[in-house]
A protein has these predicted regions:
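Glycine-rich acetyl-CoA-binding "A-motif" of GNAT/NAT acetyltransferases
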Residues: 61-66, 151
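Conserved acyl-donor/pantetheine-binding loop and adjacent beta-alpha core of acyl/acetyltransferases
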Residues: 60-61, 69-109
Length: 185
């Protein structure tokens, strides 16, 4: 089952994130504050996938197995500034950069525990959050993999995301990322 998440789900969501991204436990302290800060954005939206069907929920602990969250992008945020700089370096026109960065939803996170991947949870989570979007564009970053050969890339392509930037790096993470865009929601 899935439902919108709230701040009390944060620790379980962080566990899903660390497992899905194969990050070391010390990443928890690096990401905790930015995640909490994001929950205060007026446009913050999130969904979680849980193991227990609602009808049989008889416990206080319902294991979280998938998460997604995002918010209306702020053209002055750290992430937006990095993406805009990458777009300039890639030769995008200033008017194109402005039109995208002034009206986008930042799909900040979409993760499913590895043992639950391949069952459509990511698709359902992504579909739920996209249905709520009011912005003209959705932007996301995902680690590059050879030949786009993983479930995340297949999901994003299936859901209509196209390349904005490829082999893009962020400070603090040496891995290359694809920056993807979906337009015309």
């Amino acid at each position: 089952r899935q439902r919108q998440m709230c701040i009390r789900d944060r620790d379980d969501a962080m566990d899903v994130y660390l497992a899905a991204m194969h990050y070391r436990p010390e990443w928890r302290s690096l990401r905790r504050d930015p995640w909490e800060e994001a929950t205060y954005y007026p446009t913050w939206n999130s969904y979680g996938a849980f193991t227990t069907p609602l009808a049989s929920l008889s416990t206080n602990h319902d294991p979280l197995i998938g998460i997604t969250f995002g918010y209306r992008g702020n053209p002055h945020s750290w992430w937006s500034n990095r993406i805009a700089a990458g777009m300039r370096s890639a030769g995008y026109q200033a008017t194109t950069i402005t039109s995208i960065m002034d009206n986008y939803f930042e799909l900040s996170e979409l993760h499913v525990l590895p043992s639950y991947q391949g069952h459509g949870l990511g698709t359902r989570l992504l579909d739920s959050i996209l249905q709520d979007c009011q912005e003209h564009h959705v932007l996301l970053s995902t680690p590059e993999v050879p030949g786009e050969n993983n479930a995340a890339w297949r999901l994003y392509r299936h859901m209509g995301f196209n390349d904005l930037l490829r082999n893009f790096t962020f400070p603090g993470d040496s891995r290359p990322f694809g920056i993807l865009i979906r337009t015309g929601l």
